A protein has these predicted regions:
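Helix-helix packing/entry segments at the starts of transmembrane helices
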Residues: 15, 39, 109-115, 179-200, ...
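C-terminal transmembrane-helix exit sites in multi-pass transporters
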Residues: 47-52, 116-137, 261-281
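Juxtamembrane helix-entry segments on the extracytoplasmic side of multipass membrane proteins
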Residues: 3-7, 29-38, 74-78, 136, ...
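Hydrophobic transmembrane alpha-helices of multi-pass small-molecule transport proteins
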Residues: 48, 131-151, 203, 257, ...
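Juxtamembrane helix-loop-helix junctions in multi-pass membrane proteins
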Residues: 16-46, 65-70, 104-108, 174-198, ...
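Glycine-/small-residue-enriched transmembrane alpha-helix faces in small-molecule transporters
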Residues: 1-39, 48-49, 87, 91, ...
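Transmembrane alpha-helical segments that form core, pore/gating elements
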Residues: 45-48, 119-122, 126, 139, ...
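Specific transmembrane alpha-helical segments of multi-pass solute transporters/efflux pumps
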Residues: 21, 55-112, 148, 229-247
Length: 305
């Protein structure tokens, strides 16, 4: 199995976890957005601390060096990466949770948040990354698929929550590009730990500044906090960091937007929700876009010539 295939599978698993987390996030919309984010982020830190130790022990048993930064420069780079990725993730997650709190429609939230699938390659142009025609066609197919899947009744009027979710998509795009820049240079699990420590501190400060967090809230919403903290934050974002290595960030964003597909399929399989022909067509188009983006068309055409 090639590294690209393995990384793509990690990102698909990441998308699967994120897709099921939308329901949990919506269930937590009755809680303050920053308080909910603080709860899930501290839970992620608690999960990642022993995970780092476990990976170090595994590497030692295999005779490989662990991921600890060995020099002051490496430690500084890890802190810089964690601070940048964590700040972007905090801002993106806060915008998303605030948007969902104002309008708990998971369908529209899923569509608008997944617009990073277009924004990542667009922002990449400013960094000198020109995507192939194959990639841009895949992006267009993905947007059509997302619209068919998520927007059953059209947009309706633009709400303030929509602008927050679009801001979330912009910030997630920056976070994806930051992970793409830093992840090949350091241990991915450690980067995820520092990233979520930054998110935890930022969201805790914001919760005390703008909300009135109470222990009763954390008890009431313990289920959504635990699921989002352990699975969506602790596991899925670590898979994102590991999966983005050696993978074009535009292709990575395309794979991760499958969270909308997995959200719909999960509702159909587990909650027995109806999946219309329109929604099924959206799922098919999204999967087709991901496959098209990774087909070695250039190599195939050269071999035929």
């Amino acid at each position: 199995m090639t590294n690209q295939t393995k990384n793509s599978m990690l990102l698909m698993l990441c998308a699967l976890i994120w897709g099921t987390a939308f329901v949990a996030q919506s269930a937590g919309s009755g809680m303050g957005a920053f308080s909910f984010l603080a709860g899930r982020s501290w839970m992620a830190v608690l999960v990642l601390l022993p995970t780092v130790k476990a990976f170090d022990a595994l590497h030692h048993r295999q005779g490989r060096p662990d991921g600890k930064p060995k020099t002051a420069a490496e430690r500084k780079l890890l802190l810089k990466a964690g601070l940048m990725c964590g700040t972007l993730l905090f801002l993106a997650s806060a915008a998303q949770q605030l948007g969902i709190t104002l309008d708990p429609s998971t369908a529209k939230a899923g569509f608008l948040t997944a617009m990073y699938v277009v924004l990542v390659p667009v922002f990449g142009l400013f960094l000198g990354r020109k995507g192939s025609a194959q990639l841009w066609v895949s992006m267009a197919i993905a947007v059509v698929g997302l619209y068919l899947l998520c927007m059953k009744d059209g947009f309706g009027s633009i709400q303030s929550s929509d602008w927050l979710l679009l801001l979330c998509a912009v910030l997630f795009s920056f976070q994806i590009m930051a992970v793409d820049h830093f992840s090949p240079q350091m241990d991915g699990v450690r980067l995820s730990l520092v990233e979520f420590f930054v998110v935890s501190v930022d969201s805790t400060v914001a919760a005390f500044l703008f909300e009135q967090p109470a222990m009763a809230e954390f008890v009431t919403f313990a289920g959504p906090i635990l699921y989002c903290g352990i699975m969506s934050s602790g596991v899925a974002y670590t898979l994102q960091i590991l999966g983005q290595r050696d993978l074009n960030p535009a292709v990575a964003s395309l794979i991760m937007c499958l969270e909308s597909v997995f959200s719909a399929l999960g509702g159909w399989l587990l909650l027995h929700q109806n999946l219309s022909f329109r929604e099924s067509s959206g799922c098919v188009l999204l999967f087709a876009a991901v496959v098209l983006a990774q087909l070695p068309l250039g190599r195939l055409m050269r071999s035929k010539a």
